[in-house]
Amino acid sequence: MSFISSDDSDFRWIDDYSQGKIQLGLGTGDPKFDEFFRYKKEFLIINGHSNVGKTTTALYLIANSAVQHGWKWVIYSSENRTASVKMSLMQFAMDKKVADMTYSERKEAYSWVQEHFTVINNEQVYSYADIILFMEKVMRQQDIDAIFIDPYNSLKLDMKGTNIGVHDYHYEAASEFLTFSKANDIAVWLNCHSGTEAQRRKGPDGLPVAPYAEDTEGGGKFVNRADCFVTIHRKVQSADPNIRKMSEIHVRKVREVETGGAPTPLEDPYCLIMNLSHTGFTTRIGQRALFQPINFLEQAQMPMNINFLG
């Protein structure tokens, strides 16, 4: 009966785990961050308030995965110009503004983006089913490690021919993304807005506090389906300019802790600080970037063959 799990396969996994043979998720470049978050081929949901830099922080983490691990991504960002998304990735890769790059550097950085990222045009509004269909088409043409959908809330509600309500539709969408991730061994990152009530909640300093997972617009159905859940928050109206530059990363849920990662302490998130040029982040502790910027011109220089000199 095919619906029953394989005892042999399950025992093999348990035996491998007991011997420390289960591979951990891929590292971030910072051992402290690795305690809470690792790159895995799983269904990850991000939430946060509007205008706190969710997309920017996520794109930096995405660029990090491409630089350090060679991950290849499909990106659908409906609220940002596709050229702007590519430019951000170029700048993160080189830690340099495009205006400060030479023409050759811009060409090399853009080629790197083309190699690692497929960006879906956002001239139309798509449903979650459309996005899955696009993914299947891209995967038939090339290897893909992950997809970033930004934001989920902008996707079209396509409920034609169904007898379900909006709540069930969103639950079905989350379930479909989870199933797609597992069936294809691919990471699915879903960026979501927080609900209105959560945006009204203030801390002792009078500033909005980070939303919880259940504060996601649409409710707790999203955290229920997610393998990993992350909240990105920034105090954009703080009087302290250093606080305004700091992105808090709250890891709310890690389903499979056996492969690395764990929820961050409630009042002590992991933090990244935007650099002065807005082309990268550094860690709060140690003030170091997660990865070394790529020097495309240095890579392009081939060593001279001097064997002919005898």
Locate the predicted segments by residue.
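Hydrophobic/aromatic beta-strand patches that form the interior of the parallel beta-sheet core
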Residues: 44-46, 74-76, 118-120, 189, ...
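The Walker A/P-loop phosphate-binding site
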Residues: 2-95, 306-309
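C-terminal regions of RecA-like/P-loop NTPase motor modules
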Residues: 2-12, 18, 107-110, 128-144, ...
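Conserved inter-motif catalytic segment of the P-loop NTP-binding fold
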Residues: 28, 69-167, 172, 297, ...
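Short, well-ordered alpha-helix to beta-strand connector turns
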Residues: 41, 116, 226-227
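Signature of the SF2 helicase/ATPase Hel1-core->accessory helical subdomain module
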Residues: 154, 193-196
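Structural recognition of the conserved hydrophobic beta-strand(s) that form the central parallel beta-sheet
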Residues: 75, 148-149, 186-193
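Generic hydrophobic alpha-helical scaffold/packing signal
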Residues: 34, 47, 59-63, 74, ...
